[in-house]
């Protein structure tokens, strides 16, 4: 029997005794109480078989039944409480039920055991009513309760009967519907495991690309091979072309020196910021000395003064000559460095290469390093020319 929405069957202990137990035991017509509570031999059935036989469910996870008394022996009041899977055992002392300071009944608590030491979550609150004639009290009211969750109740029961079986079947019937709906819908969820390979491959590919890029940047063999393929005569021709262009720019500045307007006074000395390795340190000395002894910065000393001091350029042609001879000194420094490098190739190096067994490889390495040094020195020289040109134009 289903109760209307908003109504709950939750009588008190006093109402159970007065309004249900007494009429069930004394009245001839018990239909008014039987319509709500069914009569079942509770202590002969396993607890998971009882929910399906209840006519109404209480507010809690509980079910009410009338149980006829069944004495275990001919004498005494000991009841039959053994089932197929276990037994019901009384725990604690009975709790008296009072009305107007008079005891009208008592409540006993029974626990269901599947063995002597295995206690389950099934509990019975058994109500006994008192009257003047105790021979008339042939029924008790049992409130069967389950203290565990619905999942535990369904797993503890060997058969899927009762309310737990109905609810379990409802859940099982809903699962295929949800699966079918999810498969037919456009919002079907993808399995995240299928993207695991992609997420793992991306960092690996990035690491490989970074490693190859670093190797390519650190590898100077390609540049050295290109530099070795260019003969020294072409380097000298290229330097001469730069000298001609520089002489033209210097002469143009000399002819138009009266139009020069320096925005700010320039001070300081140009420094060589490009670093080279330890193997080229000895080759760097001639170039550095030649530049320091030349008039690279002194030739442009006129840019550090005002317009009235530029007239000194006409009186001192030595500055112009020094400017013109700048590139010639750098070219001479290159030739000197080449001669110095050739002289440093002594028999000791050849003997050492022979002992290692890599004489040819050692010569190629020295040649590549020498060409790389020339290339870096030319780059620094071009940077200085561009810097001087920008200063002269301003």
From Swiss-Prot:
Keywords: DNA-binding, Nucleus, Transcription, Transcription regulation. This is NAC domain-containing protein 3. PANTHER family: NAC DOMAIN-CONTAINING PROTEIN 82-RELATED. Residues 152-173, 264-300 are annotated as: Disordered. One of its GO terms (cellular component) is nucleus. PROSITE patterns: NAC. It is found in: Nucleus. It comes from the Eukaryota. Residues 155-165 have a biased composition (Low complexity). Residues 104-153 bind DNA. Residues 3-147 form the NAC domain. Residues 286-300 have a biased composition (Polar residues). It comes from Arabidopsis thaliana (Mouse-ear cress).
